[in-house]
Amino acid sequence: MFSTEPRSDTAPGSPSCSETKRRKVRRGTHSCWECKRRKVKCSYSNPSDPRCIGCRRRGTKCLSQQDVDEGASVVSAAVDEDRRIGDRMVRVEALIEQLANQVVNRESEKVVGTNDSESDLATSCSPQDTQTLKHLLPQKVNSPSTCIEYAPVSAALHAALPPHEDINLIIKAGLDVSLHRLMTTSLATLSRCIDGFRAGLAEIPSVDTHPTLLARYLLILATCLQAAHPELHAKEIRCLSEPPRLAMRRLVNAATDLVTSKDELLSSVEGLECVMLESLYLANDGNLRRAWLVCRRAMAVAQLLGLHRVDSQQLPCLTFLSQSVDPRFLWFRIVCTDRQLCLMLGLPQGTPDVSMATESALANDSASGRFERKQCVIASRILERNEASGDFTNDDLATVLKLDEELQQAANEMPSSWWLVPNLASSLHDQNKTIWEMLRLIEQMLYFNLLNLLHLPCMLRARQPA
């Protein structure tokens, strides 16, 4: 127990002890100055110990409250020390916050640097387009922690890149064009942009880029290689380190195994774009069933993200895109691709949604875009007709005639010059013109395919069983 006699590190009877001023304390007071200041229990392991357990553990001087001068100085020094510690903690917190902001800024700069092609689209568009699309700017969902988490995946994807010499040869051959922008950008917007279909192969992503962006680059590169002509690009093909077909398969396999098959990497604009690029590659490669499976997966992910809703919100994005991404347009592209594949494979459609052909949607699109949207709705009704069971009736004939009338009416809205057969040979040296002519040819092909699929089942179906 603490007695009323003073306790200190100085032995009793010494000169320094006798010179210490005393003060009267309340009867029963046993705490030293430090324990009183900290409001903790003051106890001794042995009554003869010069210091209490708390002061011995803290390494502080143990003074009785009877020692006025020294006790006051100790308390004052302790208060000053606490204040200094508090100031240091504030400075440390400020430094940590500053360092964290610097790391985030560096990561953002790296990601933006790997996606200059998206910025090119916005800078090449007119100011009116940029102002109209500002409110649809996607959110960014990238952080240093995610980059660190997926560092091994990014390293594996980066290792799958072909040599820089091969990429330069592909660009030199004029193959730096891709249809991937059609997934996120309307024809009306692309028609007002310079080099809107440029693939951006020159902006090679670094090893610490997010894996979804690396996979996107690999898939775009694979679709560009699909356009390589064995005769027109024979010189460049011979100089490549590996044949284009082997390179395409290797690039797509890497992107599929490491990204598009991982659900956690698909909840963004770029993630959905990767899945649709894989479906596009498979369809162009003749693997329609696999392309349908991949497209249906993209539709399921889009529905989980709420893209099928009329009031769908902005999608999260991995980069600071200057171009905007309309979630409703991305949903329209997924649905349109699904219906075209279902028509060719005889499969039911994934959704009966026809909101892509509302008056507001048609008014904000170009002539080709309106034609494409109307065809998408007619394709949905053809698929519904094909799924209906039972024998062919007069009502079915009336439905076919009505759909034929709507299809012809949509076709008549296009100018007569649009229906001329595109001359791709005359535009070989103009990449932008070539891609637009090819798009016109594809739309014509889809129209006549719809016309055939509308009437052939009626012509081939027997009225009575054989």
From Swiss-Prot:
Keyword field: DNA-binding, Metal-binding, Nucleus, Transcription, Transcription regulation, Zinc
GO MF term set: DNA binding; DNA-binding transcription factor activity, RNA polymerase II-specific; zinc ion binding
PROSITE patterns xref list: ZN2_CY6_FUNGAL_1, ZN2_CY6_FUNGAL_2
Consequence of gene disruption: Abolishes the production of eupenifeldin.
SMART domains: Fungal_trans, GAL4
Compartments where located: Nucleus
Biotechnological utility: Eupenifeldin is a bistropolone-humulene meroterpenoid first discovered as an antitumor and anti-leukemia agent. This metabolite also shows anthelmintic activity against the parasitic worm Hemonchus contortus, anti-malarial activity as well as antifungal activity.
InterPro entries, sorted: Transcription_factor_dom_fun, Zn2-C6_fun-type_DNA-bd_sf, Zn2Cys6_DnaBD
Keyword Magnesium in record: no
Biological process terms in GO annotation: DNA-templated transcription
Annotated signal sequence range: none
Listed GO CC annotations: nucleus
Stretches with biased composition (Polar residues): 1-18
DNA-binding residues (ranges): 32-62
Region span, Disordered: 1-22
Primary role: Transcription factor; part of the gene cluster that mediates the biosynthesis of eupenifeldin, a bistropolone meroterpenoid that acts as an antitumor agent.
Protein's name according to its UniProt entry: Transcription factor eupR
